[in-house]
């Protein structure tokens, strides 16, 4: 996860490419319950960064936030389907040399124990039937993170054929 970004805007082509990755994501029974809100307005980004008590600050410094929602009335796998779309957008951003961070919204709380989902829903006018899963903050990296150490991979967590 990259949490610090430069002030450089993303090209319209980059934004489109990232969103296409989400739109092309697989979903259970091809019901495609997810819908995305792409936010580039600094004032709205700052507001969204206040959706929960901790962990959402990277949104304020990002060039783009993608709010990942899904229609809860279409399928009981909306969380899984939206998660696949979200991670594919993060992988696409990485492929473009950009940084991103998954900010969990579903099941989290903001000030005065207000559900973060309600805060985001009210801020962006999201209908009640849409579950708000997460917000992806995306931008040009202003930090580098050390990659995972392959020598510390926990292969004992992999089971072949049976437990």
Describe each region flagged by the PLM.
Residues 1-163:
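Acidic, surface-exposed loops and disordered segments
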């Amino acid at each position: 996860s990259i949490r610090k970004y430069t002030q450089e805007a993303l090209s319209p082509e980059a934004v489109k490419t990232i969103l296409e990755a989400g739109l092309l994501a697989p979903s259970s029974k091809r019901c495609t319950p997810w819908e995305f809100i792409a936010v580039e307005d600094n004032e709205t980004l700052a507001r969204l960064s206040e959706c929960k008590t901790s962990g959402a600050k990277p949104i304020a410094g990002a060039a783009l936030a993608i709010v990942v929602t899904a229609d809860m009335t279409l399928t009981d796998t909306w969380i899984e389907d939206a998660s696949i779309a979200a991670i594919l957008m993060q992988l696409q951003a990485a492929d473009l040399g950009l940084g991103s961070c998954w900010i969990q919204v579903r099941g989290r709380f903001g000030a005065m124990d207000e559900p973060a989902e309600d805060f985001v829903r009210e801020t962006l006018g999201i209908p009640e039937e849409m579950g708000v899963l997460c917000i992806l903050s995306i931008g040009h990296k202003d930090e580098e993170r050390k990659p995972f150490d392959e020598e510390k991979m926990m292969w004992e967590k992999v089971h072949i054929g049976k437990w």
